[in-house]
């Protein structure tokens, strides 16, 4: 498993970082399984933004405000999912406004967007809650259900429904500052993690600009280990992988590339 400090070893001063806040009692209660984290992580990685932290918070305005203010000061971007629907417990919009010290109002741009999906009779007061946007925010398009997300400062607010979140992420992605994509290599070793650990620590020590993580698995009644190497520098990544293969061959472990996993 990744040791403390390994994450920092692959970062540079021009790295673009991010955090994700998952908002919703239904996630914390186990009633709903989050399906957004892995999609967001992969999307951000592909455009050179490193996701460094994920938090799950309740639909409580004060708790959302605290998390947003802490994380937006620490990371290049903060993304949120959930809590921008039409019901009383959808408090994310108000929380983001409170975090930035701005007012919330019905946004004519949001209303116009929603008119493309709803008739005037269907634009009930409940649905118009989804047109409430913090002052100064940019809208994030939602071609699926029309009610937009928004971006205020370095905070991007999206829906929690996976399909809607995905189109919002596609819409906002081109606006974000890009970094160097994180590259990775994976190797499957048919040996327990404990047999690999000492040598793996030596490889990590010799290659501080590469993050090396080990992940045990149990298959066909046997223990094994996936080793994942990550870096923004391809040459350093390849050098670390070469060192890993030298270790594997020296120990006589059965192993194979797992980059398609």
Where are these regions (language model features)?
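Proline/glycine-rich low-complexity loops and linkers
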Residues: 63-69, 90-179
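Glycine-rich phosphate/diphosphate-binding loop of Rossmann-like nucleotide-binding domains
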Residues: 12-54, 58-59, 238
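Short coil/turn connectors at secondary-structure junctions
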Residues: 15-18, 74-75, 134-136, 146-147, ...
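Short, Lys/Arg-enriched N-terminal segments with co-localized hydrophobic residues
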Residues: 2-10
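An accessory alpha-helical subdomain
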Residues: 154-247
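Glycine-rich beta-strand-to-loop/alpha-helix junction loops that act as flexible
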Residues: 23-25, 80-88, 160, 215, ...
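Conserved short beta-strand edge segments in small beta-sheet-based binding/regulatory domains
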Residues: 247-261
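N-terminal small/polar loop signature for handling phosphorylated ligands or for N-terminal nucleophile
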Residues: 38-91, 96-98
